[in-house]
């Protein structure tokens, strides 16, 4: 039996709602979200499967003007994700209006030459008139647009219609992944992302963006507990102090929230061992960015 299947890359500036859209489609949290820009650093394949289709959503870092080497690699990963896919889902933020960054992303999307669906997000915040103005501007800059949609990813409004349009545009093809698989990323990656999400939720200003989480060890203990040891890298001693908190209060809070979500993910008890370490200017160092964080897998 043939199904509709293929790869759909999400493109847009930071904090436009790409990860929220994917989680809404999946009906569960697969990728981390926060209200801060540049939460997503790596390219992540999220796999949606139903009785007549399999859609592999390629969630990418937001395209922005990079301020450091990490940012350069993030943008490179996002741009490269648009190549070799069946569709691009170009997302915009209605509340922001059509910005210079949106214009930059539109040019990149247009240059990819790939069939494009435009989704203007946050219509519940901006209102229909402002959202439609954004959608029309975006459409005027991208040649290969097949449809424009106005949605609220957070509330799930319009998400089903976008999903149905994606299915309509995808070719018939094979089932690429088992039907119970929701991402192609390993547990170590998911664990690091969950820890990083809690840091984004609980800290402010430059601290979350200056943080890298590296899983050093995952092993089963004889008592059935899953042991996970992670290093959290920051760039300055002051950031380390904030992450640890008074009498260890902040790192304990991060650890508790991350552990609870990890236990839900793996379905058993987890012992989470977190260590905060200083690596000065790690965002400028290729080895950490490419090897430790894993962006080398996103850049061909």
Curated annotation (Swiss-Prot):
Record-annotated KH type-2 domain positions: 195-280
A GO cellular component annotation in the UniProt record: plasma membrane
Stretches assigned to the Era-type G domain: 4-172
Positions of region (G1): 12-19
Molecular functions (GO terms): GTP binding; GTPase activity; ribosomal small subunit binding; rRNA binding; small ribosomal subunit rRNA binding
Predominant place of localization: cytoplasm
Pfam family, one: KH_2
InterPro entries listed in its UniProt record: G_ERA_dom (IPR030388), GTP-bd (IPR006073), GTPase_Era-like (IPR005662), KH_dom-like_a/b (IPR015946), KH_dom_type_2 (IPR004044), KH_sf_prok-type (IPR009019), P-loop_NTPase (IPR027417), Small_GTP-bd (IPR005225)
Region (G5): 151-153
Biological process terms in GO annotation: ribosomal small subunit assembly
Subcellular location: Cytoplasm; Cell inner membrane
CDD domains: Era, KH-II_Era
Binding site for GTP: 12-19, 59-63, 121-124
Region (G4) residue spans: 121-124
Region (G2): 38-42
Function: An essential GTPase that binds both GDP and GTP, with rapid nucleotide exchange. Plays a role in 16S rRNA processing and 30S ribosomal subunit biogenesis and possibly also in cell cycle regulation and energy metabolism.
Record's subunit section: Monomer.
HAMAP family, A to Z: GTPase_Era (MF_00367)
Family the entry assigns: Belongs to the TRAFAC class TrmE-Era-EngA-EngB-Septin-like GTPase superfamily. Era GTPase family.
Protein name: GTPase Era
Organism annotation: Thermotoga maritima (strain ATCC 43589 / DSM 3109 / JCM 10099 / NBRC 100826 / MSB8)
